[in-house]
Design a protein with these regions (language model features):
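Glycine- and aromatic-enriched mobile tails/lids
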Residues: 1-14, 18-245
Length: 245
């Protein structure tokens, strides 16, 4: 995510919860401010940087992508794999069961590997029986890419940090959780203080997650006059601000 709330995919912006930048513990006001500022910056960047016509190379890439989609859609309609409705329900249930508030690392790892294996030949292993199911088939693929990225991040955090935030990591060797009568309900890995000053980055397909140190807050001279002057400079010469990170 750069200063314009543009993701690593050029032209794709994310703000608010979708950006995943709020952190584990944050005041509600800062989350709201981040959402509002991010949306504003993204809108400005879209307006100021979209004045150029697409290059010949970009048009060729779009046409090639359209042809790939046509062929992949034909494969879905001819496929004899798992039907899209069954596929979606199966993965949704597994995520809720193993990767919700209670997290099972072994089952999450198995689910991650299953999703990665399916993505390697998604169109050959998925079937859309009617044209109406084609949109869901494409959404399922996006769901699996997202699912694998989320599981990568959760597994990395579980291994390094234990139970943290709203996620309890279950383990037979963990600390017992008891009800009001002292009866043991389950055992969970205690929270570790490691990586409190780090953020978790997930990138790539297949996804890889890693911790990186957070950046210190910059010391800025953010008076109204200076902020307004910078805004006007962005409007006058947007190309200077297109690739700011």
């Amino acid at each position: 995510m750069d200063v314009n709330w543009q993701t690593g995919v050029e032209g794709l912006y994310a703000a608010g919860e979708a950006a995943g930048t709020f952190g584990l513990s944050r005041p509600g006001g800062t989350a709201l401010n981040s959402t509002q500022v991010g949306s504003q910056r993204a809108a400005e960047h879209i307006v100021f940087s979209s004045r150029r016509a697409l290059s010949e190379t970009a048009w060729e890439a779009l046409l090639s992508a359209a042809e790939d989609i046509r062929k992949q859609t034909e494969t879905l309609l001819d496929g004899c794999g798992e039907r899209v409705l069954s596929q979606r329900g199966r993965f949704q249930q597994a995520m809720s069961r193993f990767a919700g508030h209670l997290r099972n690392p072994r089952q999450m790892e198995e689910l991650f590997q299953e999703a990665e294996t399916l993505l390697e030949d998604y169109f050959g292993k998925t079937a859309a029986h009617t044209p109406d199911e084609i949109p869901m088939a494409w959404k399922n693929r996006d769901m699996l890419v997202t699912l694998a990225s989320v599981l990568s991040a959760i597994l990395t955090a579980a291994q390094a940090c234990g139970s943290r935030g709203s996620g309890l990591v279950a383990s037979p060797e963990g600390k017992p959780l008891r009800d009001g009568r002292g009866r043991e309900l389950l055992r969970v890995v205690p929270m570790k203080d490691d990586h409190r000053a780090h953020c978790l980055i997930t990138e790539g397909i297949p996804p890889k997650s890693r911790f990186v140190p957070v950046r210190s807050l910059p010391r800025t001279d953010d008076w109204f006059e200076t902020v307004w002057a910078e805004y006007n400079r962005r409007r006058e010469k947007p190309e200077k601000y297109e690739n700011n990170a």
